[in-house]
Amino acid sequence: MCAAVGEAWVGAGRGVGDVVLFAVGIHAIGGIVRGGLPITGARGRAGSVGWVSLNPVEREDYRKVGCVEAEVAAAGIVRRMIWRIKAGDRSRVQDAVNDDLSAITVDHILSAARANDGVSISVVRDTAKYLGMAAANLVALADPEMLVLGGIMASAADLLLEPIRVELGRRLPKAMIDGLAVETATLGDEAAAIGAARLAGAAVR
């Protein structure tokens, strides 16, 4: 929530009335800002995109497979790469970690994709599809003027932004896409602190 307020106040969404933030890193987070103020919901959990369903699996621990966080946060991306390697695919990621699969990070996968590693490109493509699905769900619910994409979607925009845009176009009606600005976040890790300061200042006025 605070990160969304920060981006809406002085970040990518500055001057825009209705903003939705969707960011993915270690976790998947979201936030909805309308008229400069966050929409928090009855329990302060509005915009909790990490719990949105993406995969209709039936598992005892839903947090590990099926929801946005499980599929597209860092651990989920790495898990897909490890699955591919264990299935017999060979990737330059293995060379980067000396075949220690426990050492694989998202950065290894992104770097390999930029170097035209086929397995990494496939993993990134699958990730972008899931990210686009989640983003489309947020847009459908909030109908914002701007969708701000943060975390790896900003740092790896060269790999992810266009596929996410394509997925939005596939999954949403034209009337909902027309006029929707899709931008990458600009405040990085400082967004939450900036947003918290904004809310604290508003509370004392």
Q: Across the structure, where does each feature detected by a protein language model lie?
A:
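Conserved phosphate-binding catalytic cores of ATP/NTP-utilizing and phosphoryl-transfer enzymes
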Residues: 1-21
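Well-ordered beta-strand positions enriched in small/hydrophobic/aromatic, beta-favoring residues
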Residues: 19-22, 52, 182
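Short, small/polar residue-rich loop motifs at catalytic or cofactor-binding pockets
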Residues: 24-27
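Short beta-strand scaffold segments in enzyme catalytic cores
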Residues: 29-33
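A short, polar/charged loop-to-alpha-helix boundary motif
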Residues: 45-61
